[in-house]
Swiss-Prot record:
The keyword Nucleus applies. GO terms for biological process: DNA damage response; meiotic recombination checkpoint signaling; negative regulation of DNA damage checkpoint; negative regulation of glucose mediated signaling pathway; positive regulation of double-strand break repair via nonhomologous end joining. GO terms for cellular component: nucleoplasm; protein phosphatase 4 complex. Core regulatory subunit of the histone H2A phosphatase complex, which dephosphorylates H2AS128ph (gamma-H2A) that has been displaced from sites of DNA lesions in the double-stranded DNA break repair process. Dephosphorylation is necessary for efficient recovery from the DNA damage checkpoint. It comes from the Eukaryota. InterPro entries: ARM-type_fold (IPR016024), EVH1_PP4R3 (IPR055236), P4R3-like_central_dom (IPR006887), PH-like_dom_sf (IPR011993), PP4R3-like (IPR051137). One of its GO terms (molecular function) is protein phosphatase activator activity. This is Serine/threonine-protein phosphatase 4 regulatory subunit 3. The keyword Signal does not apply. Its main location: nucleus. It is found in: Nucleus. The gene is PSY2.
Amino acid sequence: MTLHSTNVTRTDSKRVKVYLLENNEWKDTGTGYCHGEVVSTELVDNKREEAFLLVTNENEPHQVLLRSKLEGNIEYQRQEETLIVWKDVEGKDIALSFEESLGCDTLCEFVVNVQRSIEPNISLVAVKSVDNGMGSIHEIITGPVALPSIETKQNTTTLLDALKILNDNTAFEYLKTETVEYVLKNNYIDLLIAHFHKAETEKIPRDLFLISNILKTMILYNQRDIIESLVEDKRIMGVVGILEYDTEFPTSKANHRKCLESEAPSFKEIIPLENEELKTVIKKCFRLQFLKDVVLVQFLDDNNLGLITDIILDLETCIIDSLQTDPFLDNLLQLYSKDKIYNSELTDESTDLIQKRKEGIKLLHQCIQMSRNLEHMDKSKFYKVLVKKGLFNLLDYAFNFEKDNNLRILATDTIIAIVEHDILLIHNVQKEISQHNDRQSLCLNGNQNEAKSSEANATVDLTLLEILSTILLTDNNPGLREQVVQALNTLLHPEGCIGDGFDNQLDNGLDFDDNILLRKDSNNLDDDFQEQTGMSKIPPFTLNSSQQLENQIAEYFKQFYIQIAPKLFGPLIENNCMSDEERQKYVNDDVLMIHLVKLVSFICSEHERLISRKFVLENGILDSISNLINPGYRLQLRLTALRCIKNIICLDDKYYHRHMISNELYSPIMKLMEEHLLEDNLANSALQDFFRIIASECHVFKDDSELFNYSDNAYNINATELHRRSGSIPSSNFTMLNKHINDKYPEVLDKLLYITFVKQLREQYKEHSKLLPNGKKRKISADNVNDFDGDKINNGKKGQLSKNKVMNYNSFETHIDDRASSTDSQPATCLVGSPAAYDNAV
């Protein structure tokens, strides 16, 4: 061997102290500058490289304090930030203490490079003390890594060694990383699959179980690249085949391959998908879902489950993004175009096309489910694309032509997902389409005024509400009805309509509590605004910024009560156009009536009070609900109606209270109480709660009345004068209700004195009676309530309120509130149906 040339490569020098261990004590051998150097010797037939750590004396640079070769199985330990300690091949313990941590970093990096390129058997380990000082943590920075054999011919021995190595390498992150790179680089999974097929053919169960455990161990490495490689086309069948064998169930085997090959989970194209990249992503997403939910469901821990879920979410996002630009969605939704559907009725439509439409509903539902995890803006973008491409045609087909209840439920779930995200999204997209069509018409016809007129007269599209209402009234499937009611609640919730319209209000320096511009009780809007903001009037710029949204929401609910509510609540509307047979069919449908009663409670509580109250009272809906409490109906329906009545009286609304008193709507409640007088059941508890509400509110009013009379002299004078002139005492809606039930149903209440709340009501009634002028009682019966609620004007008929009377309630409400707060010494003139008349009658 002939020497050719020698090259030396060195690192920067760093100041350091050198220590040697002698007699169990560290001896300082001097201070100098340390550097690492690699000596490359070129020989004729090969190249030899050697690495050294050299320390030269800081005062005498030519004097070498240390020259240590990096060789053999030396383990270098980095302790804390500035120490490197090791034992050389001769057994000497050496330590280098660097002046700065940067110097230690430089030499550690040198050791890492030497291990990777020159001396693979050396290692570098970081040693860190734990917080309590009672131990240390070791982390491998670099070092030799034992790896499984990649010989083509595997056997039981090599598989056992591989399993042991893979398990050992999970101890340190460095070992895991090196193992993953090795496995992917050398296609080790393909090697396992090949031997698996051989072992299965030759019936070698030990090898089959070993391969299964090896693959599961690699899954536990929790590395994304390995997980994704398992579901590639060339590997997926082999992987699920390996995972059919489980050492926990040695006598049985799963059938994952059969499931993938023969049943529905296989990739199915309703219409041809030409985008091969998208097709690959869809397949990979499904296979990962299959692994997570079926194959590995009993094996995955939380970390593995989280990783696979994250991968699936990323793939689903990719799918949704691709579908928005791919023609696949257009081709799919063309199956539901109205021309094709209605024309197909004239001929025998092929079974294949019907099946495609069924599968299309499932596919769109899957896409909607995928989109639930998208960001808000991405989700809105996708939903808008669906609506523009014809989603409503699909929904129309599902609800009007499809007979499979499961598919109808999926279509309803699709609606719910969209309206829960943005209740106005569908309407806004349809409005954009309408405006676009108007602009096109303008370009073609050149008639600008006509286009403007068309846009100005555009009305709110309530097609979705109409579809849902029809389903609720006509479909008997309980699961579908539940979803429809959920969708209706979302569509009809005022807060859902607000959306992001007020996001910019904070930019104006204002903090609106609960969006006071859209409160249900908005009669004193300026006062509420002044109380919360300190401003005397609502600033014009605030109204301008939200005016369009407010008008849109107001029109939305206005049209609901005109177009949809009469049909939706038809079974509860008195004197509607239904035949007796049709009405009886609805009334006998307990599930439907329960849903409708809950919806009535919802709109009374959540909607603008004026418009919802007008609709409810004008159509005698409360009378119908009260009638449902009578005997002859299912107990659950009777209790639902009772709950609705309780919710409405809790609104503390004058008009609701007077209507229910004057029409004796509490009579069925008392009958129900008599039925369950001494029973310990749900009905009795619900009825006790009814009395609790009245008793507690009467008590609260009493306290407030005392505070009003004695807290301020001015108020005391005005209140006394008002009471003297009106000949009445201060009252509340609940006080009136208490008087009504005590005057009307004393026998029933006397039987209920064992109930604390009923006893309180009787005591409050007696106390209230003593306070009446001259000690005279005045009963609140249906007859004398008629004196002030307008029934005598309505030809003396009780029951349903006339339209004119309800209009009176609404017209006078603002003036009434002003009058009630007035301190004018002149008594106000009482108007028909006004609160002033109501108080005076008592």
